[in-house]
Curated annotation (Swiss-Prot):
A motif (FACS) lies at residues 527-576. Residues 1-21 are annotated as: Disordered. One of its GO terms (cellular component) is cytoplasmic stress granule. Pfam families: AMP-binding. The lineage of its organism: Eukaryota, Fungi, Dikarya, Ascomycota, Saccharomycotina. Belongs to the ATP-dependent AMP-binding enzyme family. It comes from Saccharomyces cerevisiae (strain ATCC 204508 / S288c). This is Long-chain-fatty-acid--CoA ligase 4.
């Protein structure tokens, strides 16, 4: 009999659902907190971890010494004519990593909490505190300070637009907001509406002696503060350092106000890929349990000697949970930035990966595909004999042939050094990744674990346990969750086939969306099961495999369904594809791929096809049909090699000239596609492709 990693706990309620299942190690009782912890609130948990960590370094970060500007002129084809366009590239000069011990983190947590109370923020849930900032040590310290006073935190992505920011600030009646200096300019308009906000705290001093980027950082922040004061002269503005100093001086007069397990710790707004963001109310009980669930699946594998690098948005539950896991492991958490992970955008210093040398790295599919394609580009630049040697050793490693470990250590050494040289585990979460990408990075760098979860469950659902390592699955149920599958009859998924919509129960699951009873009612069954909206199946070993989201399954003209996210994860693994949105018209048989091309690989192809000569800018030739057809042909080869066929094969592609970023509103901060907006931008081109292939 096949070994089982989850077991049924009870009988199926009816023929339209499977029996509920749990991780086999918690079959009798799911966890409600981390193993070996007695904490019931996030404050208790942080204090417990920091006390245990003592004089060990718990947190590390880099400060910006300067930002260097370089202007370049590129030629771009506009309306059929070549037009010179000037672009500015920014390069960051950073300090080495600065560290703080766990003991010092206790002091800072309390100082910030007392500082907030002293300036007028009320404790014990009476006021809410908004964080609108990029991931940094100051983001986390501010969050911890709020926890020490029972102040619920409202999170918003640093890329959130004005309407979303106003919605989250007004709906929650937040009285204070922490932000980055460079985001202050985004506050003036929202603060006209959000009259409830009385305090603004910015992450760095606004100092006229700050000459970084030729004084632009100071001037931009100063102008933004002046604008805020103009529209809201009643608002009090402080720097992060000022709050700490105020808190230190108030040590003997401001008490700590401890939260209760059932108190809201965080109202986390979903990224809003299809509409107005919903505020997920997560209690201290929920989040502490969530940390326990994820930690359960890797216990004994990650610990105090590990170095965990942090760069994903902290406004995303995936990152917030894993940073608290780092405290639980008593490792050191090193803050980084997507722009400076590699030396590509740094000056006079190493990139964050080479400087910090992490052993554990958490990322999303878009990050890992970028890493993979960057490695492939470097391999393709090698002489022919070197490429042959590389792929020969890779094939040996993939087949676990004796001595392949020694050979791969020598051949892959330089590639591994680009990520710091010490990685033991990498983790993908947030969205699906192709099996090809998981295999490639697992063999080249270290094992890639897979995580799956939702904001509503504190990222708890599945984490692939290292001893159960496999490809193409979402992983093992975490230690806090009970799960079952229910029929989705109209899509052809039935529990009798071990397929259906995935439903959860457990301590991490939230109980409501903030001030949104309609969405809350729709998300839960009458008997309290949370509907994930994801279609899944039980594997023969009792692990979970995600097929797609219900809303991303589209019925085509012949009546069959295609799974958009599944297709995107596979086509995205093609070297010519940086990102892709698969669009399926219900009145057509096959889908169209809307593709953001990988310009480096595309440039090489254009030269090989004789479309351009070396030195020219491939962006000028992006609409050449010969180039698009060649890329589409290669993408179809990728699809067929990974098992796609029939209606899953694209009938054609459209190139999208602009990268999809949260700033231009084409993806969320969690890198989820805003499908309607992407399609709207290229609808005539998509219709042309369909017409040509009908």
């Amino acid at each position: 009999m096949t070994e089982q990693y989850s077991v049924a706990v009870g009988e199926a309620a009816n023929e339209h659902e499977t029996a509920p299942r749990r991780n086999i190690r918690v079959k009798d009782q799911p966890l409600i907190r981390p193993i070996n912890s007695s904490a019931s609130t996030l404050y208790e948990f942080a204090l417990e971890c920091f006390t245990k960590g003592g004089k060990r370094d718990g947190m590390a970060w880099r400060d910006i010494i300067d930002i260097h500007e370089t202007k370049k002129t590129i030629v771009k084809r506009v309306d059929g004519k070549d037009k010179p366009i000037e672009k500015t590239w920014l390069y960051y000069e950073l300090t080495p990593y600065i560290t703080m011990t766990y003991e010092e983190m206790i002091c800072v947590m309390h100082d910030i909490g007392r500082g907030l109370i002293k300036i007028g923020v009320k404790p014990n849930g009476e006021n809410k505190f908004h964080i609108f900032a990029s991931t940094s040590h100051k983001w986390m310290k501010t969050f911890l300070g709020c926890m020490s006073q029972g102040i619920p935190v409202v999170t918003a992505y640093d890329t959130l637009g004005e309407s979303g920011l106003i919605h989250s600030m007004v709906e929650t009646d937040s009285v204070a907001i922490f932000t980055d200096n460079q985001l202050l300019s985004k506050l003036a308009v929202p603060l006209k509406t959000a009259k409830n906000v009385k305090f603004v705290i910015h992450n760095e001093p606004i100092d006229p002696s700050d000459k970084r980027q030729n004084g632009k950082l100071y001037k931009a922040a100063k102008d933004a503060v002046d604008k805020i004061k103009e529209v809201r002269p009643d608002i009090k503005i402080y720097s992060f350092d000022e709050i700490i100093e105020i808190g230190k001086k108030a040590k003997d007069e401001v008490e700590l106000h401890f939260p209760k397990p059932e108190d809201p710790a965080c109202i986390m707004y979903t990224s809003g890929s299809t509409g107005t963001p919903k505020g997920v109310v997560l209690t201290h009980y929920n989040i502490v349990a969530g940390i326990g669930g994820v930690g359960h699946n890797v216990i004994g594998w990650i610990g105090p000697t590990d170095r965990i690098i942090a760069f994903l948005p902290l406004a995303h539950i995936f990152e917030l949970t894993f940073e608290f896991e780092a405290f639980y492991w008593n490792g050191i958490l090193g803050y980084a930035n997507v722009k400076t992970l590699t030396p590509t955008s740094t000056r006079n210093c190493q990139g964050d990966l080479m400087e910090f040398k992490p052993t554990v790295m958490v990322g999303v599919a878009a990050v890992w595909e970028t890493v993979r394609k960057g490695i492939l580009a470097k391999i393709n630049e090698l002489p022919g004999w070197s490429q042959t040697l590389f792929w020969t050793v890779y094939a040996l490693k993939e087949r676990n042939i004796p001595c392949s470990g020694l050979l791969s250590g020598l051949i892959f050494k330089r590639i591994r050094e680009a990520t710091g040289g010490n990685l033991r585990f990498i983790l993908n979460g947030g969205s699906a990744i192709s099996i090809d990408a998981q295999k490639f990075l697992s063999n080249l760098l270290c094992p890639m674990l897979i995580g799956y979860g939702l904001t509503e469950g504190v990222a708890n659902a599945c984490v692939l346990e290292p001893e159960h390592f496999d490809y193409g699955i979402a992983g093992d149920l975490v230690g806090t969750i009970t799960a079952k599958l229910v029929d989705v009859e109209d899509l052809g998924y039935f529990a009798k086939n071990n397929q259906g919509e995935l439903l959860f129960k457990g301590a991490p699951i939230c109980s409501e969306y903030y001030k949104n009873p309609e969405e809350t009612a729709a998300a839960f069954t009458d008997d309290g099961w949370f509907r994930t909206g994801d279609i899944a199946e039980w594997t023969p070993k009792g692990q979970v495999k995600i097929i797609d989201r219900k809303k991303n399954l589209v019925k085509t003209l012949n009546g069959e369904y295609i799974a958009l996210e599944k297709l995107e994860s596979i086509y995205r693994s093609n070297p010519y594809v940086q990102n892709i949105c698969v669009y399926a018209d219900e009145n057509k048989v096959k889908p169209v791929g809307i593709v953001v091309p990988n310009l480096g690989h595309l440039s090489k192809l254009a030269i090989e096809l004789g479309i351009m000569v070396p030195g020219e800018d491939v962006e000028s030739y992006i609409h050449e049909k010969k180039l698009q057809d060649a890329v589409c042909k290669d993408m179809l080869s990728t699809a067929k090699s990974q098992g796609l066929n029939g209606i899953e094969l694209l009938c054609g592609i459209v190139f999208f000239e602009e990268e999809w970023t949260p700033e231009n509103g084409l993806v969320t901060s969690a890198q989820k596609l805003k499908r309607r907006d992407i399609l709207a931008a290229v609808k005539p081109d998509v219709e042309r492709v369909y017409k040509e292939n009908t």
